[in-house]
From Swiss-Prot:
Gene assigned in the entry: EML3
Official protein name in the record: Protein EMSY-LIKE 3
Annotated region described as Disordered, given as residue ranges: 1-40, 122-221, 284-330
Keyword Transcription regulation: no
Residues bearing the modification Phosphoserine: 390
Originating organism: Arabidopsis thaliana (Mouse-ear cress)
Biological role stated in the UniProt entry: Probably involved in the regulation of chromatin states. Contributes to basal immunity.
Top-level taxon: Eukaryota
Domain ENT: 50-137
């Protein structure tokens, strides 16, 4: 291209013409000479991906809460249901997503294992109660007759309280004979503690002991201790566990053959026992009567099973002598020795004393009095039957 000769005047007219076809008029060049044209498509894609990730996190949080609730219990309470509803709003979980997440939680392997473990655990916990409640054929008849006397027995003195911690409750194997004190390896039946199945008020069974704590309810450091006491019948030591304490009477509950079919118990004033008649596992607390001769403090009274002892001093082992050969079913017929029955009025005074501190309902007190009178009649009837059995067996000798 030819240009006119420059006259070198130094003006702009002397410069060659510029070519402006390379860039658009409105384009703004960047530092590298290229226009910055922003594309909105990549930004929209990134935004959608972030929203998706956020919602996934929300679903994971919602699913975790469902798993936690299912792990706690299969039944959802109203409080949890309300909380789940609020979380669905806050975490933007739709109904369809809720159903899908709930289905995943129910199918989760860990939740399934927890559910099976909970079901098996509940079955195991219910089995011991069923065993305790199932009476054996040999004694089912006597237990039916004992219900009335057992319900009132706890009003006066109450059975020993099962307030022991599970670790303090000795098992049946732990109560087998052969402990520190001398004596036979196996204990013969405590005949003075056993009653025939003829209607005499029997001791509360294991189920009653578990569900009906004693009236004393006072803590004593001796509760849970294991002792061996000597019986005057055979001069042998027998193992027992202290399970309760009555501070009003100053008596401790001694349970023999605990958690077994032969379980028996009595209320005892340990201070009235000669040191030679009681031995302790571990350190001797030193509360037994100092001095005296063996057997001191035992007395000749009889304890009504499940009820209070008589007002005479001494232990709950009475002077009953009921030693007879066992029958074919293993339950021996007892011969009558000597039975003392606590007067009904005395029991009524004990009941009034117990209820007086808690302002009982007068109707309930009257009901208790009626049952106590029935209790006495049942005892008298049982004694008459025992005399008949004794006379019949004496004639066969």
């Amino acid at each position: 291209m030819d240009y006119r000769p420059s006259d070198s005047s130094g003006t702009d007219d002397d410069l060659p013409p510029s070519h402006q076809g390379r860039y658009q008029r409105n384009a703004r060049p960047t530092g590298n000479g290229r226009p910055s044209v922003l594309n909105s498509a990549p930004l929209s894609r990134v935004h959608n991906e972030m929203e998706t990730q956020i919602h996934l996190i929300e679903q994971e949080a919602y699913s975790s809460i469902l798993r936690a609730f299912k792990a706690q219990s299969d039944a959802i309470t109203w409080e949890k249901e309300s909380l789940i509803t609020e979380l669905r709003k806050e975490l933007r979980v739709s109904d369809e997503e809720h159903r899908e997440l709930l289905s995943r939680v129910n199918a989760d392997e860990m939740i399934r294992r927890i559910r099976e473990w909970r079901k098996a655990n509940s079955l195991q916990s219910s089995v011991p109660q069923l065993v305790h409640d199932a009476p054996s054929p040999a004694v089912s008849g006597s237990r039916k007759k004992q219900k009335t006397s057992q319900s009132i027995a706890s009003l006066a003195m109450g059975p020993p309280s099962p307030s022991l911690h599970p670790s303090m409750q000795p098992s049946s194997s732990a109560l087998r004979r052969g402990g520190p004190p001398p004596g036979p390896k196996t204990k013969k039946p405590k005949t003075s503690m056993q009653y025939p199945s003829t209607g005499i008020a029997g001791r509360p069974q294991a189920g009653a002991l578990t569900n009906e704590p004693g009236e004393s309810g006072s803590y004593d450091p001796l509760v849970g201790r294991k002792v061996w006491t000597k019986w005057p019948d055979d001069n042998q030591y027998y193992e027992a566990v202290i399970t309760d304490y009555n501070p009003v009477e100053g008596r401790h509950a001694l349970v023999y053959d605990i958690n077994s079919a032969n379980e028996t118990w009595e209320w005892v004033n340990l201070k009235e026992i000669s040191p030679g008649d009681i031995r302790w596992e571990g350190e001797d607390p030193g509360i037994s009567r100092k001095g005296g001769h063996p057997g001191q403090g035992r007395g000749t009274k009889t304890m009504a099973r499940g009820g209070p002892a008589s007002n005479a001093g001494g232990r709950g082992r009475g002077s009953m002598r009921m030693q007879q050969p066992k029958t074919q079913n293993g339950i021996g017929k007892k011969a009558l020795g000597e039975i003392e029955i606590l007067h009904t009025e005395t029991l009524l005074k004990e009941v009034e004393k117990v209820f007086g501190s808690v302002n009982p309902n007068p109707a309930e007190v009257e009901k208790a009095k009626r049952v106590l009178r029935d209790h006495e009649l049942a005892l008298m009837d049982a004694i008459a039957k025992l005399e008949e059995i004794s006379d019949g067996e004496s004639g066969n000798i």
